[in-house]
């Protein structure tokens, strides 16, 4: 299988082909996901919760993400590798450049950052300097205390319009990929149709171009809070690689996410 690039994902969107993404944090799991055909792997700051045992993602450092990015890079040959910029590691344009440099040098193909219009200058500067950007809007976990918890965003008309405007502005600034999290399916569909870049959903209905889940949720090994939008594929398959294939197949045929994983 040929290597996945941002151009590959654009082609998928244009052809209407759904693609898949999973988080990964080490070489062994990354190699398994890569060989089964997962298109995008994310070294997410979710590692703060699922690996380090924190209540949220805020304690994760640039060094943490860089370490796990190097680990994942060694295990893959096909998937596009994205690395999260951790909390407060991109508060200014200059800081964003420094953090992105460290993660790209660790092996990332793209960096992901959370937020809306305040990020536009950073997205523009990264793009101008050859760093591919994935933006993340909707429920942004690094802002969990501002939101008052992990809550669905964009349910009222004003906030829905704000999120749509953010998506358009981030694309115009140069973002090549967008993650939208925990928003109503109708809003996710509107964003996906309004943008020319690929849109990945998590808790955002089935009409996005791609779907991403945390690997621990897919394998049923998460402790504590289990998001409504997740699905334990290991329970129905009994084997890790089969679980990954089931996730890929259900995204491809549109059966995941189902109504039980979707917000209105």
Swiss-Prot record:
The keyword Cytoplasm applies. InterPro entries: Pantoate_hydroxy_MeTrfase, Pyrv/PenolPyrv_kinase-like_dom, Pyrv_kinase-like_dom_sf. Keywords: Cytoplasm, Magnesium, Metal-binding, Pantothenate biosynthesis, Transferase. The keyword Protease does not apply. Its EC number is 2.1.2.11. Its main location: cytoplasm. GO terms for molecular function: 3-methyl-2-oxobutanoate hydroxymethyltransferase activity; magnesium ion binding. Its cofactor is Mg(2+). Pathway: Cofactor biosynthesis; (R)-pantothenate biosynthesis; (R)-pantoate from 3-methyl-2-oxobutanoate: step 1/2. PANTHER family: 3-METHYL-2-OXOBUTANOATE HYDROXYMETHYLTRANSFERASE (PTHR20881:SF0). HAMAP family: PanB. Homodecamer; pentamer of dimers. Catalyzes the reversible reaction in which hydroxymethyl group from 5,10-methylenetetrahydrofolate is transferred onto alpha-ketoisovalerate to form ketopantoate. Belongs to the PanB family. This is 3-methyl-2-oxobutanoate hydroxymethyltransferase. It comes from Shewanella amazonensis (strain ATCC BAA-1098 / SB2B).
């Amino acid at each position: 299988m040929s290597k996945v690039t941002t151009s590959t994902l654009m082609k998928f969107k244009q052809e209407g082909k759904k693609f898949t993404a999973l988080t990964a944090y080490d070489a062994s799991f990354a190699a398994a996901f890569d060989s089964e055909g997962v298109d995008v792997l994310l070294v997410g700051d979710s590692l703060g919760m699922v690996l380090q045992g924190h209540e949220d993602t805020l304690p994760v450092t640039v060094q943490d993400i860089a370490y796990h990015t190097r680990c994942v890079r060694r295990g893959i040959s096909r998937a596009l590798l994205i690395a999260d910029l951790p909390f407060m590691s991109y508060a200014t344009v200059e800081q964003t450049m420094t953090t992105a440099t460290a993660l790209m040098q660790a092996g990332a193909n793209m960096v992901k950052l959370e937020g809306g219009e305040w990020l536009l200058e950073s997205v523009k500067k990264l793009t101008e300097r050859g760093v591919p950007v994935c933006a993340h809007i909707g429920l942004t976990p690094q802002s969990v205390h501002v939101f008052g918890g992990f809550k669905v965003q964009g349910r009222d008309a004003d906030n829905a319009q704000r999120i749509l405007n953010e998506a358009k502005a981030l694309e115009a600034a140069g973002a090549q990929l967008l993650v939208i999290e925990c928003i109503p399916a109708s809003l996710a569909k509107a964003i996906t149709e309004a943008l020319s870049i690929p849109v990945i959903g998590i808790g955002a209905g089935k009409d996005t171009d791609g779907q991403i889940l945390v690997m621990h949720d897919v394998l049923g090994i998460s402790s504590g809070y289990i998001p409504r939008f997740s699905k334990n594929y290991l329970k129905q398959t009994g084997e890790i690689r089969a679980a990954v294939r089931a996730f890929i197949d259900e995204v491809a045929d549109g059966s995941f996410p189902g109504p039980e994983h979707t917000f209105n």
